Every structure is written in structure tokens, then in C-alpha cells.
Amino acid sequence: MSILPILQIGDVLVSSDIFTEKFCCDLEKCKGVCCVEGDAGAPVTLDEVGEIENALDIVWSDLSASAQSVIDKQGVAYTDQEGDLVTSIVHGKNCVFTCYTSQESTSETDGGLPPGCCICALEKAFRAGKSKWRKPMSCALYPIRVKVFGGGLVGLNYNRWAICKDAVLKGEQLNIPVYKFLKGPLIQRFGEAWYTELCEVAEQFGY
């Protein structure tokens, strides 16, 4: 049975790419470069901006001086050229919450992340038990991007980015489709019942 380009599951329009494409982050190779590259910050909601502001004192010392300066001047988020609310950035690309593991990083010191790896300061605080909020949902769901339509309808699209080529290769080697790689974030965003239905649709089409 051939799969349709777009499927509707509940109030969510799902691109079939999340079933057919493989993906698994390979931080040993990419070092978390997705937090650095790009011409805009990560998409955020107003509620998420509030969560970030609440965590700011906790993560402040992990931020670069340049990032602190940007936040002092314009806050933790801004509206980009497309009209989307996104996290503030430094030098036209780095998210202000970018920080790095040490060159002597170990599983005990940096949660198993490789040395010199970029990590979100918000997630670092969460992993250390200093904050109850992890990071923006748009970051957790990457490489899926969420598009909000009217009437409560949202769309999920697979975003292809050249810097994630190692994640695609690892996903292919391990045979992990995008929707399985992002099981946790998808459940967090849409719920267990919705994800179960998503898996049933995938199985129906042989994925």
C-alpha cells in the first residue's frame, strides 16, 4: 500500500516523510551545531518565553558575555523576518543559550555528551536537576517543524538540513525513522494516545 504525502491524525496533518525518512542525532560527529548555525533562533511560544525568563537566573553564568549583552538589550526572544517569535541570537546565528561541554568532558561531568559539544544551557540546567523546564518544544522536536493553522489544526513537516547529514546516516544505519527517534517529544507535545495512533498508521503502511 502506497502512503499518502499528507495524513491527518486527529487535528494534526502529518507529512509522510516522518515515516519514510531515517534520523538519529550523532553528537560525536556534529557536536550540536544545529544550535549554532542558521539565521534565526528557535521558534518559541509566549508561554515558553515565560519559562525561559523564569530559568534565566539559573543559566545566566553558563551564557557567553555576548549572549548576556544581547539578552540585556532585547530580551530572550524577538520576532524574526517571517513574523515568528524566536530565541535571541548572537552574531546573526548562535542561539543565546548556546554553551559547550569541556574538552575533558566525561559521562559524569556532562551527561555523556562528547567533549567540545554544543549544548543548550536550559537543557544543561534541566539535566543537572536545577530546573524543571527542559527547552523549547521546537528544539525537542527537531528535525520536525510544527506549522500552526487556524481552527486548532497543526502540521508536522520533516525539515532537511545539510548539517544533519550525519544524523541521517546514523538513522539509516540503525533503521530509525523520524517518528520513532522523536517518540518522547511527540508524546510530550501531542499525548500518548495520539502517538499510539501515529504508530498504528505507520504500521498500516509498513513503517
Residue locations for each model-derived region?
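Short loop/turn segments that flank or connect secondary-structure elements
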Residues: M1-Y207
